[in-house]
Amino acid sequence: MHTIGHFVGGSQVAGRSGRTTPVFNPATGEQSAEVALASAEEVGAAVAAARAAFPAWAATPPLRRARILNKFLRLLEERIDELAAVITAEHGKVLSDAKGEIQRGMEVVEFATGAPQLLKGEITENVGTRVDSHSLRQPLGVVAGITPFNFPAMVPMWMFPVALACGNCFVLKPSERDPSAALVMAEWLKEAGLPDGVFTVVQGDKEAVDALL
């Protein structure tokens, strides 16, 4: 039985906790795989890898970050059928619905490619006597998204494209019931040029969620 693992440091890695849960094909009711459930220690290691990648990613010019997201968007456009099939096999929605959710997520990716224009700071002169006001837009660091079963591609794409465009590193904890779409997107982000550690996928249940929170 195939075991679905995590995506840490730019590559897929096997779980070490020894805990798994089955993944079913809703069309047949048969088990298609099992997914590793991360321990709190594994979550901590994944977050540490993301933190290590953060300084270089935050220092990457916004335009370069946007170029990577633009390449990712093109991969989504070219391979939408592939990702839709992965979603259908684990979630059970029909292919047309799966493509629809991907397309809605792609709209956010497209928006994020315009982030360089939105990341400009502001300077206001003479707000007071000999006082100027300066504002800077800077990344926060490592951020996380915990996403539900019903939209395994769209809801993550509501989160990570903007976070990445703004210079943050992102840790995604997808539903353990349909975990594979997250890994597909992680591989395509890497193919688009995203540096290792900037995007992480941790599979898991309540223990992983509690560790992230």
Roles of regions detected by a PLM:
Residues 1-34, 67, 71, 121-147:
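Terminal low-complexity tails and localization/encapsulation signals of metabolic enzymes
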Residues 6, 14, 25, 88, ...:
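Short glycine- and Lys/Arg-enriched binding-loop motifs that mark or flank ligand-binding interfaces
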Residues 16, 43, 80, 98, ...:
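Alpha-helix N-cap/helix-start motif
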